[in-house]
């Protein structure tokens, strides 16, 4: 009964899941947060029960010790069934890492070197890896990169039309993100369609507070909406998605906004929040239903951008077998699904209202029976995908 511990570490917190790989079931999960603050906290779930504790957590090493204490006190026992691998989510692997990689000192050095591309994410992942290696010194650790799935993009998809020497010197290209989710969902879609993965043409819409689209041909990503950073592409909760870059020059010249201010504007004060003052899709929909014109416009912009990418990716794929919705908004918001695909019937893409309104946590069809293009809702499971990749990377 091999078990894998999956860790998603940030600068001041980390989440974990212990997954039994024969049945792919979650044995335990938890959260350690407020690391480095006067009062930290842990939350541990196992066997249908949950326990919380407040305590000082000086650093990630202390956080992992608190996690080990929770396992020892509440189970399951890691001494009786130690993990065969520890899988770590790492946001940015650049063009260095194209697959899950067993962690070595050289790998950690490369991840650190890539922190310039992900300053908010990679350093926290490294802290988590170091602490986890202290906690589990005899277990292989595997780094699974959000960007790796998109390393199959062709040059015409990942290249920006700027000075090529400048781009090369600063590693400027499209990397894409949410790759672990896009991989998990596209493979699940092939199984649901009953087709070999190599024969599928799938558009995945990962719609959460962060959002991205991907065109997946034969199980390989050939295009994706996020770029050098997770800022490009679809409209998101607080991020702008695609804009004319000259907007930044205009604002720099005509306001007192500096470089950091502009970065904050696009990442944290734009998207649905910037358009409406509301960052949650459900709140925006309620406001729109109550007649708020700004909210109605925001929903229109959100849907317009999704349709833009669906059409573009259908062209890149040369046809579509399935459009798949996943992540928090994509899985749980029937109105977003219906309105985002409205008007695409000429492409064979449509929604069955009864299927679409069904509340379910299962993977399912929401398109009409016999539709030329399947529309699917598939709950993503990035932790399980990390566990699968970690186990595969350490096998043999």
UniProtKB/Swiss-Prot annotation:
InterPro entries: Ac/propionate_kinase, Aliphatic_acid_kin_short-chain, Aliphatic_acid_kinase_CS, ATPase_NBD. Coiled coil: none annotated. The keyword DNA-binding does not apply. Its cofactor is Mg(2+); Mn(2+). Its EC number is 2.7.2.1. One of its GO terms (cellular component) is cytoplasm. Gene3D superfamilies: 3.30.420.40. GO terms for molecular function: acetate kinase activity; ATP binding; magnesium ion binding. GO terms for biological process: acetate metabolic process; acetyl-CoA biosynthetic process. Substrate binds at residue 89. Mg(2+) binds at residues 8, 382. Mg(2+). Can also accept Mn(2+). This is Acetate kinase.
């Amino acid at each position: 009964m091999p078990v894998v511990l999956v860790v998603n570490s940030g600068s001041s917190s980390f989440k974990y899941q212990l997954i039994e790989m024969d049945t792919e079931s979650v044995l335990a999960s938890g959260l350690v947060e407020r690391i480095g603050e006067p009062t930290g906290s842990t939350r541990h779930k196992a066997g249908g029960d949950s326990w919380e504790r407040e305590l000082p957590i000086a650093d990630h090493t202390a956080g992992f010790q608190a996690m080990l204490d929770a396992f020892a006190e509440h189970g399951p026992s890691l001494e009786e069934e130690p993990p065969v691998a520890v899988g770590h989510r790492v946001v940015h692997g650049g063009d260095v890492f194209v697959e899950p990689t067993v962690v070595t000192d050289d790998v950690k050095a490369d991840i650190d070197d890539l922190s310039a591309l992900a300053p908010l994410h990679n350093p926290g992942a490294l802290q988590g890896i170091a602490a986890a290696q202290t906690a589990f010194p005899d277990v292989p650790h595997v780094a699974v990169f959000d960007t790796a799935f998109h390393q199959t993009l062709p040059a015409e998809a990942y290249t920006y039309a700027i000075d090529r020497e400048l781009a090369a010197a600063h590693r400027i290209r499209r990397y894409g993100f949410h790759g672990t989710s896009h991989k998990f969902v596209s493979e699940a879609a092939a199984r649901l369609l009953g087709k070999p993965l190599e024969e599928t043409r799938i558009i995945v819409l990962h719609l959460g507070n962060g959002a991205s689209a991907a065109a997946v041909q034969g199980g390989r990503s050939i295009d994706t909406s996020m770029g050098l950073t997770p800022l490009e592409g679809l409209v998101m909760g607080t991020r702008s998605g695609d804009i004319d870059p000259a907007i930044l020059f205009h604002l720099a010249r005509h306001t007192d906004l500096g470089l950091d201010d502009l970065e904050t504007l696009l990442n944290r004060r734009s998207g649905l929040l910037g358009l409406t003052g509301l960052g949650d899709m459900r709140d925006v929909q309620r406001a729109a239903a109550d007649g708020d014109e700004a909210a109605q416009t925001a929903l229109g912009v959100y849907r317009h951008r999704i349709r833009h990418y669906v059409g573009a990716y259908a062209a890149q794929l040369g046809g579509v077998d399935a459009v798949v919705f996943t992540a928090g908004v994509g899985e749980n918001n029937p109105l977003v699904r219906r309105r985002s695909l409205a008007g695409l019937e000429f492409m064979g893409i449509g929604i069955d209202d009864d299927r679409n309104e069904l509340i379910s946590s299962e993977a399912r069809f929401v398109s009409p029976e016999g539709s030329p293009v399947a529309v699917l809702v598939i709950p993503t499971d990035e932790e399980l995908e990390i566990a699968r990749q970690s186990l595969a990377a350490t096998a043999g």
